Amino acid sequence: GAFKKVDKTTFYELAEKMIEEQVALNEIRQSTYKRKLETLKMLSSLSDKQLRKITEDDIIAYFKDNLDYAQSTLNKLYQLLGAVFKKAMKKGIISKSPLEDLRVPKSHKKTDKVRALTVEEQARLLDVLNNNDINYSEIMLVSMFTGMRGGEICALNIEDIDFQNNCIIVNKTTSRGGDNSVIVNETKTEAGMRKVLINNDLAAFLKECIGERTGGSLFVSSNNKPVTTQQVNYYFWNTLKQYDIQDKSLQGKLTFHSLRHTFATRCIESGVPPKVLQKILGHKDISVTMNVYCDVFEKFEAAHLNAVDKYMKLNNIVLGKSETKTVKVA
């Protein structure tokens, strides 16, 4: 019979080819491409192995050695492995994925969720940002009062501010390229493209930020380059530390992204319905809004029920026998 040539493609060869194809076909962005290559580097112990020789035991051994990675990193590694093995099956290099019967491993690391600022922390931070010269404080304030993502704020041009209709047009975001340069992309999803309404205070504040300028980026760094969220995060964190803003007794970590959560949390606390919040935040799906803010919604479910209860009692809609009898009409 005919002799079938054995496929000796290594894990690295196929993985790299797959990622290169994705970026060439515009399936992924430059920043995602860069991250995927970083993830691939972490799988170096499997890199030179031929795909057909990688076993489930190899994968288990790899993960056992790396349970100190953050959960998000383990998820990314698992995802990339899965994609490569799926591709290898499609190409007929292997008949079954060694990952098939394995679940995502659980990290040893405690995941510190990014949390919102409390009302007290927010008031303290606001006071500091309003009265001190803090780098990128304008970007922090816009995030605090619109809930926009950091990358969306950094990508704003002056002409994206519509003072006639008091809104900000969101249609792009920044990310980092392979050489650490800042790339401006369209927003990640359709839902990301939106109009964010602003109040008169914020409109006046933005007019101040713009000054005499007529176009170009709304915010730039000291060397006139676009700002990265990493830069803002650095100064945000510094400010919290320097002015002792963070309540250390609370769980969860505070980052620049906390300002988006803070805005959303204040919205829920003041009774904004989930569907409206989804639109403001630019979430593709209501489930994202509900999952990210479920604990805040739950807390306010009780408060809303109390309000309903009060309203009913006020209008004599009460369970149990009443003092006054309703007269039966014959």
Language-model segment annotations:
Residues 160-167, 272-294:
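Short, polar N-cap/turn motifs at the start of nucleic acid-interacting alpha helices
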Residues 1-9, 13-17, 25, 61, ...:
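Basic/aromatic DNA-contact patch characteristic of tyrosine site-specific recombinases
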Residues 71, 127-136, 146, 196, ...:
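Short, basic (Lys/Arg/His-rich) helix/loop patches that form interaction surfaces
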Residues 108, 116, 174, 281-307:
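Catalytic-site neighborhood detector that most strongly recognizes the C-terminal catalytic loop/helix
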Residues 107-109, 133, 151, 165-197, ...:
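Basic, Lys/Arg-rich DNA-contacting stretches centered on the C-terminal catalytic core
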Residues 7, 16-93, 111, 225-231, ...:
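N-terminal core-binding DNA-recognition domain of tyrosine site-specific recombinases/integrases
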Residues 165, 176-178, 184-193, 200-202, ...:
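C-terminal secondary-structure termini that scaffold catalytic or DNA-interacting sites
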Residues 75, 90, 94-156, 164, ...:
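Basic, Lys/Arg- and aromatic-enriched nucleic-acid-binding interface segment
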